[in-house]
């Protein structure tokens, strides 16, 4: 009996708290990606490029590029091009990116090109927010979509006006890093939580000694580290692999008002309640009636009189009981028993929370 109770208590503790590495819960402050952007031209399209008469910036960009190559286009020349498209190029400069390292780029059409499939991006400088060039992008574009048209009919799968170039940009300038400067580093929690921040600080202090870590707020833990890059790398690697018992998350229900999707975590519980959901539909039908005089020469006029009919219908509305549920599968089963659509479920959950029956935070995005 004692062994059974001990095993049961161990099972409950294991279920309530799950050990995770600090590296999965936090990130190092200052170690982040930086966005890059550039404007360029895609050539080699199979007649699916910009209509240059409607996108003058494409022609202007092409003239500037040709002039840099020593080719002069006579003034007033109306170039009817179909194989060129103006695009925006975006990329992310990774932390500690070094010269010569390659990164992926995303190419997106900004004109009226029909497709970028089969195109080649010409050399495009990628700049940061400080207007400095950090990378150069060039290469063949990979487009995931496909399309065909004939006889006025067309079929398209996925999107054709954007694509990627794997390893399509080369880093030319390194971003200065403050890593290794100073004797402290800040760890930032992925989700703010006072108890988790303090628990991580206590775990580091138990292993590295009291005073090694301090929880500054619900998201930031300050860690004292040895000076020097190599020493900080080893110290940080040891800290990130430490195990922390993760307490149960806050009960939360997330509702997407645009798509009607409802997502909830396993901490959501329901109290007993009764729910009545009625659907009210209003139909307005307007029809124009023409009234003409009976005698052709009686001096009457033809009059158009609108006739409007409004139909009001209400369905459902029966009161249904929802039992108290403490497990996620029971919560899902209880909500499915209502037979409500996702859009109806959003209003039901809001009403449940207002009545105190939904034990969770309700977040609408």
From Swiss-Prot:
Q: Which GO terms describe its molecular function?
A: structural molecule activity
What Pfam families does the record point to?
FlgI
Cite the InterPro entries for this sequence.
Answer: Flag_FlgI (IPR001782)
The UniProt keywords, alphabetically, are: Bacterial flagellum, Periplasm, Signal
UniProt superkingdom: Bacteria
This protein's GO cellular component annotations are: bacterial-type flagellum basal body, distal rod, P ring; outer membrane-bounded periplasmic space
Where does the record locate the signal sequence feature? 1-19
Question: Which compartments is it annotated to reside in?
Answer: Periplasm; Bacterial flagellum basal body
GO biological process terms on file:
bacterial-type flagellum-dependent cell motility
Q: How does it assemble?
A: The basal body constitutes a major portion of the flagellar organelle and consists of four rings (L,P,S, and M) mounted on a central rod.
The record's similarity note reads:
Belongs to the FlgI family.
Function as written in the Swiss-Prot or TrEMBL entry: Assembles around the rod to form the L-ring and probably protects the motor/basal body from shearing forces during rotation.
Name it: Flagellar P-ring protein
């Amino acid at each position: 009996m004692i062994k059974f109770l001990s095993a049961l208590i161990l099972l409950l503790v294991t279920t309530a708290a799950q050990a995770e590495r600090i590296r999965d819960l936090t990130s190092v402050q200052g170690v982040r990606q930086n966005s890059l952007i550039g404007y360029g031209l895609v050539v080699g399209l199979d007649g699916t490029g910009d209509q240059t008469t409607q996108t003058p910036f494409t022609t202007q960009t092409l003239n500037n590029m040709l002039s840099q190559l020593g080719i002069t286009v006579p003034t007033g020349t109306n170039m009817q091009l179909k194989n060129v498209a103006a695009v925006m190029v975006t990329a992310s400069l990774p932390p500690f990116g070094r010269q010569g390292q390659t990164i992926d780029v995303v190419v997106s059409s900004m004109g009226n090109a029909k497709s970028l499939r089969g195109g080649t991006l010409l050399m495009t400088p990628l700049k940061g927010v400080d207007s400095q060039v950090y990378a150069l992008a060039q290469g063949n574009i990979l487009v995931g979509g496909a399309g065909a048209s004939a006889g006025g009919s067309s079929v398209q799968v996925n999107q054709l006006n954007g694509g990627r170039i794997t390893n399509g940009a080369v880093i030319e300038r390194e971003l200065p890093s403050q890593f290794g400067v100073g004797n402290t580093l800040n760890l930032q929690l992925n989700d703010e939580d006072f108890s988790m921040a303090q628990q991580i600080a206590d775990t580091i202090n138990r292993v590295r000694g009291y005073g090694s870590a301090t929880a500054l707020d619900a998201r930031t833990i300050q860690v004292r580290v040895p000076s020097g890059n190599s020493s900080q790398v080893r110290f940080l690697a040891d800290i990130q692999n430490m195990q922390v018992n993760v307490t149960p998350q806050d009960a939360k229900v997330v509702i997407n008002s645009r798509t009607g999707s409802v997502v909830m975590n396993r901490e959501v519980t329901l109290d007993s309640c009764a729910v009545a959901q009625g659907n009210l539909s209003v139909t307005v039908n307007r029809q124009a009636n023409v009234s003409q005089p009976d005698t052709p020469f009686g001096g009457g006029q033809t009059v158009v009189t609108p006739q409007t009919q409004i139909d009001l219908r209400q369905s459902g509305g029966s009161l249904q009981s929802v039992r108290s549920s403490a497990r996620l599968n029971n919560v899902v089963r209880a909500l499915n028993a209502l037979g409500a659509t996702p859009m109806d479920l959003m209003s039901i959950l809001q009403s449940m929370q207002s009545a105190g029956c939904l034990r969770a935070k309700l977040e609408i995005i």
